[in-house]
Each structure stands twice: as structure tokens, then as C-alpha cells.
């Protein structure tokens, strides 16, 4: 299953911005896989924080092969020590076990998240240990398929904006200008800015000075073009 969008969203974005229009036409349709199961999506995102996509897939595969079904009951039965043995940090294992306990006890209802507004869902998800605002936003996009997710905390989106619009820096004011321009289809704009940041338009370079903070360097190394900032780690 892929993130659902069509000509309506693309036509809207083309009409709003010439540079994004050119990027859309040159890159073509982008297919990004989604996971419609919120429970597994939360677990998958906790596993994937600050590691490569390949490492994330390896840990997830080990978990599935060992536990069979990945659900609250099997995760609680496994416990943090066994979860850690699949290749994640003990802290992540604790976060996952705690999340499973909340779901099993009814303290957290995954189905209720789907009925919430974006702001409500982000607040509820980021209240979980191990889930910050950026991760919550990615869950809304790649699980719930919310149409207007455009994350200021996503370093690759900021990089894509710098490259496409030749900014040396994207501050909050710049970002909000683009967020308003692309709304209500910020999620589709995000897909194309991630592609730009990943080198889909090879002639575009990042005009930002090369020096990075230590935090940004760790994020970039771990997540490639899909990196973000999450303070709730």
C-alpha cells in the first residue's frame, strides 16, 4: 500500500509554485509505502530512530520471525531483554514494552488516534515515551495518511527547501510561508522535497554552509534523506 494522492493534489501544488511544479514534472509520481496499522507503525518508528532504514528492517524482521505476530500480547510476553536481543537498544526495548502495556491495559487506544485532529493525534502520540513530535508527524503521514503533514523538524524537508529555493537557511518564518503555500496538501509537497533532498534533481545543491551541529550530523548519518529532529528520545 502506498500513500494515496492523485492529480487533484498535484495540480493544486503545480498551480501554487513554479519551482515545485517543475520538480513534480521532472521527478514524476512518487510511491511511498504506508503501514495502516497504527500499533505496528509506532513500534516500527521507535525501532527506526537514529538508525539506518536497512538496520530498522533487520530488527523488524528478527522480531517478526521470533514472535510471529507483533502485537501487545507478544511484545509484553517477550519483555525488554528479549526485545533488545533483536538488535535494538535497551531503551528502545523499554519504550516498546511500555507502549504495549498501555495498549493492552486500554490506557492508549490506537483506534482513537484515527478519529483525532492532526494536532490532537500528535499530542497523544508524543506523550508516549520514545515518540517525539517529528515521529508523531511521520506516523500521521505514513500510517494515517493525513494530507497536510509538513514538518519543521524534518531536516530533509528543510534541505529540500534550501535546494529548491536557494536559501542558505530555513528559519521558522520561511518555513511557515511554504507550509501555508502548500496547505492543504503538505504531505505530497513533503514527498517531493524529500526526493529533492535525496538528489532527484542532480543539478541542485544545498547552499547551506557545510558546517553541521553534532546533532544534525548524527541524524543525517542515521537517516539519510528521511531524517528529522525528535526531542523525545
Per-segment meaning from a language model:
Residues 31, 55, 75, 110-113, ...:
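Short, surface-exposed helix-loop/turn micro-motifs enriched in polar/charged residues
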Residues 8, 14-68:
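A positional/architectural concept
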Residues 1-30, 94, 133-233:
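C-terminal accessory module of base-excision DNA glycosylases/AP lyases that mediates lesion recognition
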Residues 19-23, 51-52, 56-129, 181-183:
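Alpha-helical ds-nucleic-acid-binding substructure associated with the helix-hairpin-helix region
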Residues 41-46, 78-82, 120-124, 138, ...:
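A general alpha-helix detector
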Amino acid at each position: 500500500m502506498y500513500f494515496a494522492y492523485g492529480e487533484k493534489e498535484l495540480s493544486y501544488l503545480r498551480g501554487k509554485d513554479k519551482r515545485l511544479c517543475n520538480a513534480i514534472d521532472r521527478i514524476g509520481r512518487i510511491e511511498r509505502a504506508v503501514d495502516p496499522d497504527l500499533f505496528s507503525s509506532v513500534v516500527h518508528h521507535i525501532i527506526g530512530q537514529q538508525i539506518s532504514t536497512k538496520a530498522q528492517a533487520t530488527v523488524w524482521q528478527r522480531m517478526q520471525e521470533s514472535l510471529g505476530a507483533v502485537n501487545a500480547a507478544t511484545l509484553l510476553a517477550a519483555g525488554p531483554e528479549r526485545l533488545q536481543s533483536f538488535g535494538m537498544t535497551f531503551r528502545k526495548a523499554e519504550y516498546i514494552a511500555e507502549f504495549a502495556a498501555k495498549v493492552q491495559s486500554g490506557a492508549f487506544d490506537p483506534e482513537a488516534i484515527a478519529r483525532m485532529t492532526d494536532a490532537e493525534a500528535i499530542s497523544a502520540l508524543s506523550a508516549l515515551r520514545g515518540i517525539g513530535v517529528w515521529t508523531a508527524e511521520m506516523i500521521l503521514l505514513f500510517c494515517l495518511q493525513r494530507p497536510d503533514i509538513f514538518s519543521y523538524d524534518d531536516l530533509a524537508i528543510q534541505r529540500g527547501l534550501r535546494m529548491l529555493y536557494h536559501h542558505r537557511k530555513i528559519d521558522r518564518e520561511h518555513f511557515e510561508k511554504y507550509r501555508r503555500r502548500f496547505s492543504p496538501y503538505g504531505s505530497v509537497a513533503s514527498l517531493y522535497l524529500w526526493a529533492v533532498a535525496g538528489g532527484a534533481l542532480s543539478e541542485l545543491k544545498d547552499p547551506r554552509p557545510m558546517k553541521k551541529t553534532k546533532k544534525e550530523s548524527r541524524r543525517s548519518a542515521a537517516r539519510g534523506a528521511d531524517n528529522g529532529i525528535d526531542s523525545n528520545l
